């Protein structure tokens, strides 16, 4: 008997015999993934994670994971005729994401909780749940591509650079990548996604995209931290690089590296920027723009996705992205261990902040080689 040709998810069996768990946030992206797979005849199981207390504080436009999102995901499942489950992951989410978020700000870092959520909740616990449900794979609505290479599946940027989410998925491991599918990664624009939603008659076709961190109402992260860590907003001094006191601040957690506005120290001549935070002394250190310039970026907790081990070479020529909103820049990785390295930026970058990710791209290619966490800069 001839082998069955590979289906669109890469399995040698018909779609009807291929079970796929779809991580459904209630937004248009994951809804389209579920609808397309269901329409193609796959055995789809929708799963939505309840990650936070979905009270009035979060029942608003622009936040994911809110109460209405669970309702919307369920409506999509009903429209397309596949089962849908809601799993309570609030305790896991608090321990794996929210607590570290608060502690990072207290340590003077600027965290990216969405990366930790993907790494520690969605692509860990939810992925295991998918396996427990005997699913062949798990699909998400992320804009990123999974391509087969000579050494196995590779992570690649989305076809639509404006929607690319590779920065937030750098910590996806090889084992996870083997099990995951990203059906939207090849689309040229978000308009295509919404057109597919309309074609399937999905109730979320015109739903606004999520913008905020799901557990931070109205973007007021400082209020969340103060609630979690009383005393976190204790006031202190704003000082210059020489230690001269220029003013007072309302809590280190209100400031980020590179910040210029809202310092309350105008009239001092040249513009001043936050160049460092010292939580132990409760000081915000400011200086001229050139003081923000960083070339050497120590990176740890590296997830390396190259074909050869990270330490197999003394140097790697890459393109490095140090913030989600910035373009990758030429850089050299000098490994210290399998999970730690020094990254030299060929051209200095302003505002490199501890707590952000440094993501590695193959020069001239869409492939992602992984990345790590910035823990200090010089």
From Swiss-Prot:
A GO MF term: ATP binding
Top-level lineage group: Bacteria
Enzyme class: transferase
Catalytic activity: S-sulfanyl-L-cysteinyl-[protein] + uridine(34) in tRNA + AH2 + ATP = 2-thiouridine(34) in tRNA + L-cysteinyl-[protein] + A + AMP + diphosphate + H(+)
Species the sequence originates in: Cereibacter sphaeroides (strain ATCC 17025 / ATH 2.4.3)
ATP-binding keyword on record: yes
Purpose: Catalyzes the 2-thiolation of uridine at the wobble position (U34) of tRNA, leading to the formation of s(2)U34.
Cellular-component GO terms for this entry: cytoplasm
Annotated keywords: ATP-binding, Cytoplasm, Disulfide bond, Nucleotide-binding, RNA-binding, Transferase, tRNA processing, tRNA-binding
Annotated SUPFAM superfamilies: Adenine nucleotide alpha hydrolases-like
Subcellular location, record wording: Cytoplasm
Swiss-Prot/TrEMBL GO biological process terms: tRNA wobble position uridine thiolation
Binding site for ATP: 23-30, 49, 141
Active-site residues (renumbered): 117, 214
Annotated disulfide bonds: 117-214
Site (Interaction with tRNA) location in chain: 142, 356
Region of interest (Interaction with tRNA), residue spans: 163-165
Known EC number: 2.8.1.13
Family statement drawn from the similarity comment of this UniProt entry: Belongs to the MnmA/TRMU family.
Name of the molecule in the record: tRNA-specific 2-thiouridylase MnmA
């Amino acid at each position: 008997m001839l082998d069955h040709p590979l289906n669109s998810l890469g399995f040698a069996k018909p779609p009807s015999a291929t079970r796929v768990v779809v991580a459904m946030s209630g937004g248009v992206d994951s809804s389209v993934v579920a609808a397309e797979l269901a329409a193609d005849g796959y055995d789809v199981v929708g799963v939505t994670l309840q990650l936070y207390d979905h009270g009035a504080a979060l029942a608003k436009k622009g936040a994911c994971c809110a109460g209405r999102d669970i309702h919307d995901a369920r409506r999509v499942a009903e429209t397309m005729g596949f089962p849908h489950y809601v799993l309570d992951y609030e305790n896991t989410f608090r321990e794996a994401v929210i607590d570290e978020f608060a502690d990072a700000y207290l340590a003077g870092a600027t965290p990216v909780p969405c990366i930790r959520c993907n790494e520690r909740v969605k692509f860990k616990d939810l992925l295991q749940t998918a396996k427990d449900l005997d699913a062949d794979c798990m699909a998400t609505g992320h804009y990123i591509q999974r391509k087969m290479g000579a050494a196995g599946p590779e992570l690649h940027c989305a076809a639509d650079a404006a929607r690319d989410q590779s920065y937030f998925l750098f910590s996806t491991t090889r084992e996870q990548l083997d099990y995951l599918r990203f059906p939207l990664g090849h689309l040229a624009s978000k308009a295509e996604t919404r057109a597919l939603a309309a074609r399937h008659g999905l109730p979320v076709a015109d739903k606004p995209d999520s913008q905020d961190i799901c557990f931070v109402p109205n973007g007021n992260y400082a209020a969340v931290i103060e609630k979690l860590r009383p005393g976190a907003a204790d006031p202190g001094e704003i000082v210059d690089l020489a230690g001269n006191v220029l003013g007072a601040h309302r809590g280190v957690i209100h400031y980020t590296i590179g910040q210029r506005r809202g310092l309350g120290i105008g009239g001092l001549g040249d513009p001043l920027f936050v160049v460092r935070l010292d939580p132990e002394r409760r000081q915000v250190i400011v200086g001229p723009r050139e003081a923000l310039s960083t070339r050497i970026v120590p990176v740890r907790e590296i997830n390396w996705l190259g074909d050869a081990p990270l330490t197999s070479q003394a140097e790697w020529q890459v393109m490095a992205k140090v913030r989600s909103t910035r373009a990758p820049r030429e850089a050299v990785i000098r490994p210290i261990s399998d999970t730690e390295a020094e990254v030299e930026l060929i051209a200095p970058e302003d505002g490199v902040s501890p707590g952000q990710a440094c993501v590695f791209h193959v020069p001239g290619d869409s492939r992602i080689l992984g990345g790590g966490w910035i823990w200090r800069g010089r």
